[in-house]
Amino acid sequence: MTDLKKAAQRAIELMDLTTLNDDDTDQKVIDLCHKAVTPAGNTAAICIYPRFIPIARKTLDELGAEDIQIATVTNFPHGNDDIAIAVLETRAAVAYGADEVDVVFPYRALMEGNESVGYELVKACKEACGDVLLKVIIESGVLADPALIRRASELSIDAGADFIKTSTGKVPVNATLEAAEIMLTVISEKNTKVGFKPAGGVRDAAQAAEFLGVAERILGADWVSPRTFRFGASSLLNSLLHTLELADAPKPTQGY
C-alpha cells in the first residue's frame, strides 16, 4: 500500500463524517449514516445537528454500526458568550443521546480581550457533558493571530476540553497547518490526553497526510488514534475512497 493510500485509510478511521447544513433532513442524515459504513471500514463518528440524533442512532443500530460515535454541535456556529444558553444546548444534546459534543468557544469575546467567559463556558459545558466527550471549536481562521489561537487552546484545555477543534466550517478560513502546529504544540505542553480535530478545508489524502504528519512530529506516531485525532469533513470521504480505488466498491454486509 502506498503512503497516500495508507493516509487515506487512516483518515477514514479518524473521520467525523459531517452534515451541518440548514437544509438537512432525516433522509440526508440516514444517507450520511450509510456513507459512514465504507468499504474501507467505518468512520470514527458522524457529526449532525442535535435533532437528528435519534434517527441517526436508529439507523446506525440497523446497520450494525454501533461503534460509530454520534457527535453534535452546540453554541454553533457563532460562538456566542451566553454561558447559560450554551449549557442548556449541551444538556439537550446529551439528553438526545450524543456521544460527543462539539461546542463553539466564544472566540469574538476573546478577540475583544475577555478570557474569562471562554474558560467559564467550556468548564460549564464540560460539567453538563459528564462522560460525553467535549470538543471545543476555537474558530482558528477568524482568530487568525497565532497568540489568540494559542490562548483559546490553552483556556479550552484548562477548562476541561477533551479535544480542541479548529473550525466550524462556516467561515472562509477553516483548518490550516499553521493553526494545527500551534494547537498541537499547546496539547504537547499541557495535556497529551487532549485530542485535536482539524475541520473544514481538508480535501484529499495528501492534505490529510500533512495534518497527520504535523501531529506525529509534535506528539509522536503512537499518539494519533480516534481517541486523540479526528478529521471533521463532509466531502473528504469520497476523495479518500477514490484514492483507495474503492469509490464504486460494494459496501460490507452489516446488520440485517
Swiss-Prot record:
The entry's cellular-component GO terms read: cytoplasm
* Its EC number(s): 4.1.2.4
Superkingdom of the organism of origin: Bacteria
User: Which residues participate directly in catalysis?
Assistant: 102 (proton donor/acceptor), 165 (schiff-base intermediate with acetaldehyde), 197 (proton donor/acceptor)
SMART domains the UniProt entry points to: DeoC
Q: Which reaction does it catalyse?
A: 2-deoxy-D-ribose 5-phosphate = D-glyceraldehyde 3-phosphate + acetaldehyde
Question: Kind of enzyme, top EC level?
Answer: lyase
Show the GO MF annotations.
deoxyribose-phosphate aldolase activity
Alphabetical list of CDD domains matching this protein: DeoC
Compartment annotation? Cytoplasm
User: What is its pathway?
Assistant: Carbohydrate degradation; 2-deoxy-D-ribose 1-phosphate degradation; D-glyceraldehyde 3-phosphate and acetaldehyde from 2-deoxy-alpha-D-ribose 1-phosphate: step 2/2
> Which keywords does this chain's UniProt record carry?
Cytoplasm, Lyase, Schiff base
One GO biological process from the UniProt record? 2-deoxyribose 1-phosphate catabolic process
What is one Pfam family matched by this protein? DeoC
Role, per record: Catalyzes a reversible aldol reaction between acetaldehyde and D-glyceraldehyde 3-phosphate to generate 2-deoxy-D-ribose 5-phosphate.
Family listed: Belongs to the DeoC/FbaB aldolase family. DeoC type 2 subfamily.
Task: Give the protein name, as stated in the record.
Answer: Deoxyribose-phosphate aldolase
What is the organism of origin for this protein?
Answer: Shewanella sp. (strain ANA-3)
